[in-house]
Design a protein with these regions (language model features):
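Non-catalytic DNA-recognition/assembly elements of restriction-modification systems
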Residues: 45-74, 197-205, 210-222
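Basic, amphipathic alpha-helical recognition segments used for DNA target recognition
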Residues: 63-71, 96-97, 118, 131-194
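Sequence-specific dsDNA recognition surfaces
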Residues: 44-50, 65-80, 87-118, 136, ...
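Residues that recognize and position ribonucleotide moieties
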Residues: 57, 89, 180
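Extended, domain-scale alpha-helical bundle/helix-rich regions
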Residues: 1-44
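Intrinsically disordered or highly flexible coil/loop and linker segments, enriched in small
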Residues: 12-19, 73, 77, 172, ...
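Amphipathic alpha-helical coiled-coil/heptad-repeat segments
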Residues: 1-12, 169, 186-222
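A generic structural signal for residues embedded in beta-strands
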Residues: 123-124
C-alpha cells in the first residue's frame, strides 16, 4: 500500500537524522470494524465523523505529515538579504506566485534559515492564507510561507491541486487581529484522501487536459 511506503520512507529519514519525529505525531488507520481511527500517542480516537466522504476502493485517509515533510518558514537576518543574487533565493510570501510554478525572487540571502526543497508545495500561512505554488528549485522561505515537501511516492503536482480544496478550511482556522495566520499545528491536521500512485497520475492527466482546453478557449476569445 502506498501509505505504508511513505511511512517507511519517513522512518528511514528519521533514522538518518534528515528529519525529526513530530512530538505530536498522528497516524490514521482503518480498524477491523471498517471505521477510521487517529492514533495519538497511546490513544485511538474514531474520526468517522470528521471524514467528508466515502473513499473509492484502494484509497485511504491520512494526515498531511504522513505523506510530506512540513517546514514552517523563518526569516533570515535582514542584513544577509540582498538584491545581487548572493546566496540562495529568498521568498517571504506570495509576491512571486503564479497560477502554479513559482517565479524567481529579486531577493537572496547568504544565511538561509529555513529551506524549501526542490519540488515542494509552498503554502501561504499568513494573509492571504491558503495560496499555493510549487517551487522547482530549493529556496529560503520566510515566516509567511510553509514548505510541504512530498515523500518519494507522492506527486507534488497532485498534492498542489488537492490542497487547493482546503483554502476555505485554512481561512476558517486562521486567527489574528491585524494579519490573520495559521500555525504549524493547523497545517499538520489536514486530512488527505490518498489514492494509489497510478490514480494520482490519471487525476493529473485529467486536470491538465481540462486546463489545456480552458486555455485554448480563453485564447480564442481574446
Amino acid at each position: 500500500m502506498l501509505l505504508e511506503r511513505t511511512r517507511a520512507e519517513k522512518e528511514e529519514l528519521i533514522k538518518q537524522g534528515k528529519i525529526k519525529r513530530d512530538k505530536k505525531e498522528s497516524i490514521i488507520f482503518k480498524g477491523d470494524d471498517n471505521s477510521y481511527y487517529e492514533k495519538l500517542g497511546n490513544t485511538d480516537v474514531c474520526i468517522d465523523h470528521k471524514l467528508p466522504f466515502t473513499l473509492p476502493d484502494g484509497w485511504t485517509w491520512c494526515v498531511l505529515p504522513e505523506i510530506a515533510e512540513i517546514i514552517m518558514g523563518s526569516s533570515p537576518d535582514g542584513t544577509t538579504i540582498n538584491n545581487s543574487n548572493e546566496g540562495i533565493e529568498f521568498h517571504q510570501g506570495k509576491i512571486f506566485f503564479t497560477n502554479k510554478m513559482l517565479n524567481p525572487s529579486d531577493k537572496s540571502t547568504t544565511q538561509p534559515s529555513k529551506i524549501a526543497p526542490k519540488d515542494s508545495v509552498l503554502l501561504c500561512v499568513r494573509a492571504p492564507v491558503g495560496e499555493l505554488n510549487i517551487t522547482d528549485r530549493s529556496i529560503c522561505i520566510g515566516r509567511g510561507l510553509a514548505s510541504i515537501h512530498p515523500y518519494h511516492y507522492i506527486d507534488a503536482e497532485w498534492l498542489f491541486y488537492w490542497l487547493q480544496t482546503y483554502k476555505g478550511y485554512l481561512n476558517m482556522k486562521a486567527t489574528g487581529s491585524t494579519f490573520v495566520a495559521i500555525t504549524a499545528d493547523i497545517v499538520k491536521t489536514i486530512l488527505m484522501p490518498l489514492p494509489p500512485l497510478k490514480e494520482q497520475e490519471e487525476i493529473l492527466k485529467t486536470i491538465n487536459k481540462v486546463f489545456f482546453i480552458v486555455d485554448l478557449i480563453e485564447k480564442s476569445l481574446n
